[in-house]
A protein has these predicted regions:
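Compositionally biased terminal segments of proteins
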Residues: 1-150
């Protein structure tokens, strides 16, 4: 990618780039513990394989179950708000990671107090600037809508 810069490298697990003003993270195997082969769910794009949005949402659910970063919450928020419903994300996650703790689908989604950063804008220039409290409120409202279905 000619227009890129490395913004974070956590060898050997992950490397973050800004490519054409978009943050892109590449994970190695083992960066986030998942019980499925992520490579089976990728599609080729130029010289790399990428996951489609539904699998990225599953990886984000696994990420927030293991660590709390504003980036993961923001990505999951954005996917749930603009690309697929939270119910679809939860159902897909239950299919691909059946042993993920049920607490992830409720308390973990809405508990953002232990995230150090207040907003994703401290790191990047996101499409939508929201605080961690707004993200928690969004997930709370979405969970209320689907409480009988999960």
């Amino acid at each position: 990618f000619p227009e890129h810069r490395i913004i974070r490298q956590d060898a050997p697990w992950q490397i973050d780039f800004i490519i054409n003003e978009v943050k892109v993270t590449f994970f190695s195997k083992g960066a986030v513990a998942v019980s499925f082969n992520v490579g089976d769910y990728t599609i080729p794009y130029k010289n790399i394989n990428i996951c489609e949005a539904d699998v990225i949402s599953v990886l984000k659910m696994a990420s927030i179950a293991q660590r709390n970063t504003i980036r993961d919450y923001y990505d999951l928020y954005y996917l749930a708000k603009y690309h697929m419903s939270l119910l679809e994300i939860i159902e897909r996650t239950k299919t691909l990671i059946p042993n993920l703790s049920p607490i992830t689908y409720s308390e973990t989604l809405v508990y953002t107090e232990d995230i150090d950063e207040a907003t994703i804008a401290e790191h990047l220039q996101p499409t939508e600037i929201v605080t961690k409290e707004q993200i928690a409120d969004f997930f709370t409202n979405e969970l209320i809508k689907i409480k009988g279905e999960i």
